[in-house]
Amino acid sequence: MLNPTRLLGSLVLLAASTQCAPSKEVRADVEEKCSRVQVAILGAGLAGITAAKVLDDAGITNFTIVEYNDRIGGRVYNRAFGRQPDSDEPYFVELGANWVQGTESSTEENPILTLVRKYNLTNTPSDFDNLTVFHETGQVHPGRLSERFKELQSLYKSATEEYEYDAGEIILQNQQDRSARAGLAIANWKPSSEPLAQAIEWSSIDFEYANPPEKTSQQYSVVNTNTSFQRWKDENNLVHDARGFATFFKEEAKLFLDERTQLKLKTIVKNITYSSESVTVYNEDGSCITADYAICTFSLGVLQKEVVSFSPELPRWKRTAIQSMTMGTYTKIFMQFKPEDVFWDKNTQFFLYADPVQRGYYPYFQSLDHKDFVDGSGILFVTVVDQQSYVVEAQDFDTTKTQIMEVLRDMFQREIPDPIDFYHHNWTREPWVYGSYSNWPPGLTLEMHQNIRANLGNLWFAGEATHPQYFGFLQGAYYEGKNAGEAIASCIKNKDGQWVEYKDIRQ
């Protein structure tokens, strides 16, 4: 792995301070019609709640959080699923974010881990080496195919080491970025049509970035991985607490948030009118809020779909940047089987499937029915991303279930009863998110990314997609909410706090 100091020293957060625009009195007719606050926070996900807490800590309590859903949580979202064998009580599964990614070093913790520990959320490190490999005629047993799999793993490891070194050189030498596919090929990793090689690659690239190598930046994929997994320990702790992963920031919100006066749930924003003097938010129910400052924490997917209008229209440099980043889709498909029908080795965490025809076709199964997770639950889930996610979302549950069961019967070479419960969430079709999390594609420059983040007058933007290093991670949402809250608190206290923008970018 690259030295993170080497990379991060070359990738500084692009921020510049200029004098904040003073808020001024708004027109009397707007004042009369709309409720009035100092700060409007749009979205009650992790970025929004973190920004609100920062403001509250600074003594700024005249704010309102506006949220589309009937809950705090955003993409950290669990759901009742299946039934416990000895009662009618359900289990709970995480439909969205599920892991604490990067845990701690000798000197500091990932802030997500700190909060998970604060509220005693049950979490366990995933062991990605606890893996059994399958193809269409069953398990890859010791023998020729098993040796080939080990050989491919070794080749991939060597290629990724060169790939990561090259990413550092791209940054240090200010070279043109390229796709992860090109970078891996230069490092002599060329899986072409070999299913085992494709499966290994999928479990490393697609499973992490919700996009294939062709859609992923070599340079920034390495920055993204190194900042989490070298700054902190290279661990992924799966949260499997029945209270839900979002508990940690729901509980934080209870410490300061007055839900009667500072939180508007089930409120759909339709227009944001902004200037260097104030921001007015118009909602579908006819209500409106005028604020001195606003923080927009909408997902990249919502901004790309343009389902919320802006007045004036977002400048071209910002629209270009928004459309140039990628919103990935990561779909977990859950199945519960009767205890007597569990057909997999309960000591194994992961099952990798190398489909002979289609790369990424129901490739990665994970067992929750394991002594370290939700023992006795009979729950197995499979993850798909990108194009396969879109296919799954477009077809009915029965079709998807039939396809998965055909794969499982090929893998395990036996008759397997259908699951007693089955569910997946359609993230791409959710009108409040339109996807799972962001990814950095080849061709998106650091300056263009900063334009997603840059404020427009008194309107600020924050979320996992706006962080140049932790995009796609919960810690990205946390840090960006914190940064935006601190910047606006600084503005309110008549200090500097504007972020830089790049209106004229020439490649």
Predicted regions and their residues:
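FAD-dinucleotide binding site
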Residues: T5-V12, A21-Q507
